[in-house]
Amino acid sequence: MRALLLGFGNVGRGVADILVRRDQYPGLAALDVDVVGIVTGAHGALVNRRGLDLARVLADWSRQGGFAPSHPDHADLGALEAIRAVPCDVVVELTPLTRRAQGEPAITHVREALRRGRHVVTANKGPLAWAFPDLASEAARRGRHLLYETTVMDGVPVFNLARHGLRGATVARIEGILNSTTNAILCALERGEAFTDALARAQREGYAEADPSDDLEGWDAAVKLAALARVLMGAALAPERVAREGISGLDPSRIAAARARGARLKLVGEAWREGGSVRGRVGLREVRLDDPFALVDETSSILRLVTDLAGSVVVTEERPDIHVTAYGVISDLLTLSSAPPPRPRRERPARGAGARSRRPRRAR
């Protein structure tokens, strides 16, 4: 299977590292993947139709922070050009989320790849949060797989759990602690750290961005919640329609007050069915100490799916590192390597011009 990677940040390099060391993992024995192209936004691109030497790619990146024009596989290609020009079986979308652009250009990358007959694995949650129904329909029409396990909770099999483990059950409600940065900062505030110190430490340790506003203002959790609601609840819930409260400007007295009431203050995302639609919100909530949500510390996360038939299902993730996130992509590649492509969905012709009508049966 030939893979084209769009983006080579922490997750992309984690994927490459796992592929380089795949012989160390018995469960990856069946994974036959050649990365034939890597495209970055500002650090160049590499293309080799026989497969790139990923060990050398990682070493060069570590030394140079990009792809030098002198590299024998260097190519002057952007993402869309690569999708159109580089023969591959799967496009792996690893570019950063652009919330202000409502998921673009990742949405266009995914759509173009599907239209050209490629399978798609995306770690970017934007295409799910803003365009999932259209992209899923495009994949079905083309008979291609669209996989996205890494978009929420890193490598935890959230979507595979719902797809294979909750067959026949309807998700009525979603609740989750979905943003690692804000949860770690809240834990630090509980210990008496100043907000600015807690944020600076999160940035030093690499789980907060240089511009942390999307995390602190609840946008990251809102985008993840919208992605979950679209996929698991069939909801037309865009991130902008999720009511939002972040932790910027949080009065530390709220944390102490929650503790005095036998609770912890957590930033929780919720989506629920109401009046034929799905509503969502992200906000600070006091959770009782006997609630599993109260046990979620530092960069860990948790998701609760409330269903009609399977009851309440809870999954947690404890302090993931970048290889856990990369594993979600590897898991999707394993799915592609073992699953036959779905049959293209035929569009039914509409009644009217060009549509064949049936003759009414003669009454007997």
Label every PLM stretch briefly.
Residues 188, 199-295, 300-302:
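Substrate-binding/catalytic subdomain of NAD(P)-dependent oxidoreductase enzymes
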Residues 96-116, 123-163:
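Rossmann-fold NAD(P)-binding glycine/threonine-rich loop
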Residues 140-208, 219-220:
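Rossmann-like NAD(P)H-binding beta-loop-alpha module
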Residues 120, 146-147, 209, 265:
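Hydrophobic beta-strand scaffold residues
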Residues 90-93, 121-123, 146-150, 173-176, ...:
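General beta-strand structural signal in soluble alpha/beta enzymes
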Residues 1-115:
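N-terminal glycine-/serine-/threonine-rich beta1-alpha1-beta2 phosphate-ribose binding loop
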Residues 6, 10, 14, 33, ...:
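Conserved active-site and cofactor/substrate-binding residues in soluble primary-metabolism enzymes
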Residues 173-175, 183, 189, 201, ...:
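Catalytic, metal-anchored helix/loop core of enzyme active sites in primary metabolism
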